[in-house]
């Protein structure tokens, strides 16, 4: 027999017990059952946050998966009062994202083919404090045809993300066939300080601090022979900004992998770092780090790098980091590890 309860609040715990009623005699003919506890399903996207006003002293509170999805919606739709640089968020509980088959990143980037620093709209620009909590069962599985693709829990970060732990799987594949950029990271896909801030940078802009990731990350250029793929446990590509006190754990069942056209860069912390700093970060595990190519056509210059902390650096500093990796490091002939 199936019973339906109506009028219940979403994502709320209830207790229920039952007792049989004989209708013909209109009397109860059994003892009460034991109390059973259950929790109602969450909405896909919440109507409001759990509290707060968005200031540093009174941040917007996130206690449910649907409220994290609301943050993604507010940033990606540029909702006034929720996406600006001075808006603060605080995670107040561990979250399980298993109800989202394909998570929409917080900050998708411009989605118009340009780098986010050329058009920083739809980047996360505020301050997100994870409160030491964990986001479990993250699943990002992007497939599309955009020239620039950046995915992670956060797609593009131009703000501050701190005190956050994430476990799950992040992947991106493009069907674009010319000069594509495909970037994937466990916490952040693409980390930047927008060019408009370069002369007067906001404090904390492009910062990832005290974060950790456990799981798999992959970025593939599909059939594009001219594409660039970057993947990292914390961040796929950092054009600038700082990554401090972060950690990636790559268990035996997990992989961080790129499949590029011309360029393929894979790192335990970041795939590539083109400015800024990585400091006091740790990479451990027994899984697989791989920088591969979709094709090796004649006439193309190809470039592959993989490393425990970062695959490739340019005008960036690496300070006080450690890598204790007992897994497999795979690169094509001629690549660098």
Outline where the language-model segments fall.
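Conserved beta-strand positions that form and line the central face of beta-propeller blades
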Residues: 4, 37, 61
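Short, isolated positions within intrinsically disordered regulatory regions of eukaryotic proteins
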Residues: 17, 36-39, 107
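Surface-exposed repetitive/solenoidal architectures
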Residues: 42-337
């Amino acid at each position: 027999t199936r019973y339906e309860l109506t009028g219940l609040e979403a994502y709320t715990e209830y207790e229920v017990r039952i007792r049989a009623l004989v209708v013909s005699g209109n009397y109860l003919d059994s003892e009460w059952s034991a109390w059973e506890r259950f929790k109602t399903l969450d909405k896909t996207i919440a109507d409001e946050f759990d509290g707060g006003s968005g200031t540093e002293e009174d941040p917007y509170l996130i206690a449910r998966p649907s409220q994290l999805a609301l943050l993604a919606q507010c940033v990606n739709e540029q909702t006034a009062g929720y996406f600006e640089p001075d808006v603060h968020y605080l995670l107040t509980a561990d979250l399980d994202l298993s109800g989202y088959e394909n998570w929409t990143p917080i900050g998708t980037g411009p989605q118009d083919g340009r780098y986010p620093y050329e058009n920083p709209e739809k980047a996360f620009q505020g301050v997100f404090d994870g409160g030491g909590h964990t986001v479990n069962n993250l699943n990002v599985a992007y497939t599309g045809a955009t020239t620039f693709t950046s995915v992670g829990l956060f797609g593009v970060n131009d703000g501050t993300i701190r005190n956050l732990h994430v476990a799950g799987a992040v992947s991106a594949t493009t069907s674009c066939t010319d000069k594509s950029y495909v970037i994937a990271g466990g916490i952040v896909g693409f980390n930047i300080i927008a060019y408009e801030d370069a002369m007067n940078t906001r404090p904390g802009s492009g910062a990832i601090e005290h974060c950790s990731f456990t799981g798999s990350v992959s970025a593939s250029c599909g059939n594009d022979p001219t594409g660039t793929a970057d993947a990292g446990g914390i961040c796929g590509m950092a054009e600038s900004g700082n990554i401090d006190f972060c950690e990636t754990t790559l268990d035996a069942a997990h992989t961080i992998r790129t499949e590029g056209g011309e360029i393929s860069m894979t790192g335990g912390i970041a795939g590539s770092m083109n400015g800024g700093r990585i400091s006091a970060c740790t990479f451990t595990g027994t899984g697989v780090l791989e920088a591969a190519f979709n094709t090796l056509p004649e006439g193309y210059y190809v470039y592959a790098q993989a490393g425990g902390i970062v695959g490739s650096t340019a005008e960036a500093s690496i300070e006080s980091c450690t890598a204790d990796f007992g897994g497999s490091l795979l690169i094509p002939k001629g690549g660098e590890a």
